[in-house]
């Protein structure tokens, strides 16, 4: 019985130590601007990479609008949107990367990652209607192909908000 109690105590301490080691990082410390105008894709991705390399934690978005294109969430990183924070999708379709593995575009990608999440009281606004209208204009001007002649982007050319694939331990 004492071995069982010791094992339970050791597990509890390890779980507590893992929680204590999780740290908060402010996305603004990596150069992200909450003005709704500045394209923050690079700053947000650098922040995600840094948090991942440091063992994980929460990447905190304070109040404001953070304009972004495609970002890749990595293991042990949680995007935390405080009340009043908006992760705002760019309306420029060229700000999104078509992932070569899945051939889709998304604002937030995660592929084969673990212990990831998006939490908080903030908002994710992909601005899908505006983005779709911009894509239709690009089709009409011959910039985007429309092989089916539907005068709209096909499914692989429209960015999704969130695309997680083969991920474990996901919190939304």
Give names to the regions the model predicted.
Residues 1-8:
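Bacterial N-terminal signal peptides that target proteins for export
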Residues 8-16:
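Bacterial N-terminal signal peptides
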Residues 20-172:
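Extracellular/periplasmic carbohydrate-active domains that bind, remodel
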């Amino acid at each position: 019985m004492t071995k069982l109690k010791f094992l339970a105590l050791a597990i509890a301490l390890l779980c507590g130590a893992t929680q204590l080691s999780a740290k908060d990082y402010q996305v603004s410390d990596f150069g992200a601007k909450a003005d709704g105008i500045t394209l923050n894709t690079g700053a947000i991705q650098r922040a995600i990479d840094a948090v991942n390399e440091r063992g994980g934690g929460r990447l905190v978005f304070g109040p404001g609008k953070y304009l972004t294109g495609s970002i890749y969430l990595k293991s042990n990183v949680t995007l935390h949107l405080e009340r009043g924070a908006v992760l705002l999708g760019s309306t420029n379709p060229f700000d999104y990367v078509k992932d070569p593995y899945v051939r889709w575009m998304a604002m937030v990608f995660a592929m084969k990652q673990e212990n990831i999440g998006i939490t908080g009281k903030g908002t994710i606004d992909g601005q899908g209607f505006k983005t779709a209208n911009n894509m239709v204009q690009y089709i009409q001007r011959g910039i985007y192909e429309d092989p089916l002649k539907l005068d709209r982007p096909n499914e692989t050319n429209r960015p999704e908000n969130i695309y997680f694939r083969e991920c474990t331990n996901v919190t939304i």
